[in-house]
Design a protein with these regions (language model features):
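Surface-exposed, charge/polar-rich loops and edge strands
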Residues: 1-41, 45-178
Length: 178
């Protein structure tokens, strides 16, 4: 089965540095097939016979720790499941508008997106939109006023940031086609 691993918080402001070519090699050496990486933010596509995504995430965390000596949260989703999720996107999400920033927030096991949403609170209605779908939340906000958006302020705070990983609409569209 084809999967996507989304690593949380790597290669940001010089922290948690992971080389994508080295990560690709590590995945391949540990038995994953047809490994590809996309961008420097920790997007890894791979194939494996395992069907338990929790086991896959644990295996990947162990590979990262063994190879890079970093404890990195990992979200795993099948490529088909991600395609299905994107097909359920609300009409306001994923537009080509340069004024709006479209993201998908994934809750990393064992957390649920409902728990994350409860901790963050209501979105700022005039600045951002949120719609929960499965264990993810479609989220869009005004680029110019992002600092005032409630979800923007809280997604990186302690107690919430480690529960999630976020990707843009454009990144996810590219990944599902790889």
């Amino acid at each position: 089965m084809r999967y996507i691993a989304l690593l949380r918080g790597i290669n940001i402001s010089g922290k948690n540095k992971i080389s994508m070519p080295e990560l690709k090699i590590a995945f391949s050496e540990k038995g994953f097939a047809d490994v590809k990486t996309y961008l420097n933010s920790g997007n890894v596509l791979f194939s494996d016979d395992e069907t338990d995504i929790v086991k896959l995430a644990e295996r990947i965390r162990a590979i990262i720790f063994e190879t890079f000596h970093l404890e990195i949260p990992v979200f795993v989703i099948s490529q088909d499941e991600l395609k299905g999720l994107l097909s359920k996107a609300p009409s306001w999400w994923g537009s080509d508008s340069k004024d709006i920033y479209d993201n998908l927030i994934f809750a990393i096991a064992p957390y649920s997106i409902e728990t994350v949403a409860e901790k963050i609170g209501e979105p700022s209605s005039e600045l951002e939109k949120v719609e929960i779908c499965g264990n993810a939340a479609f989220w869009a906000f005004d680029r110019k006023l992002y600092a005032k958006a409630n979800w923007w302020k809280k997604t990186a705070t302690p107690g919430i940031g480690e529960m999630i990983t976020i990707r843009t609409a454009n990144t996810l569209r590219k990944i599902v086609e790889m």
